[in-house]
Amino acid sequence: MRCPYCRHPDSRVVDSREADDGQLIRRRRSCPECGKRFTTVEEAILAVVKRSGVTEPFSRTKIIGGVRKACQGRPVDDDSVALLAQKVEETVRAKGAAELPSHEVGLAILGPLRDLDEVAYLRFASVYRSFESLADFEREIETLRTAAQAREGG
């Protein structure tokens, strides 16, 4: 790594630490030429390929925005939405791919959102899965009921 002070082409890593729940690596570096120290931050870039074919960087902020819209008027606090977005990011990063289709990001949102708030889940799923009729909603509600009964043991 080039020194930002004297432009010497090499530096020595003095210390490395994880940051942002393991999503970043902060490295403290020292320049052998001028002796000054500086910090670098490394992050693995995750790209999302949209339906149109356009690629853009993964954005936890976009996840939070979409989930907030689905949760509008529901008793869901901001911390729960932020935690859901973190879980989604961890899930998609765990796949190990540098690029993934937006469809997979949507799937990663649906599970945690269903656990957080079923009405918000229905709202999100209706847009994500392009519900076109009342029958689509009825099918999804029946799926939710069946899952709830299975959890309750009856």
Swiss-Prot record:
Keyword Nucleotide-binding: yes
Span of domain ATP-cone: 46-136
Function description: Negatively regulates transcription of bacterial ribonucleotide reductase nrd genes and operons by binding to NrdR-boxes.
Record-level GO BP terms: negative regulation of DNA-templated transcription
Superkingdom, taxonomy of origin: Bacteria
Cofactor note: Binds 1 zinc ion.
Keywords in alphabetical order: ATP-binding, DNA-binding, Metal-binding, Nucleotide-binding, Repressor, Transcription, Transcription regulation, Zinc, Zinc-finger
Family from the record: Belongs to the NrdR family.
HAMAP family: NrdR (MF_00440)
PANTHER family assigned to the protein according to its UniProt record, in alphabetical order: TRANSCRIPTIONAL REPRESSOR NRDR
Cofactors, names only: Zn(2+)
Zinc finger region(s), unnamed: 3-34
Zinc among keywords: yes
GO MF terms held by the record: ATP binding; DNA binding; zinc ion binding
Protein name: Transcriptional repressor NrdR
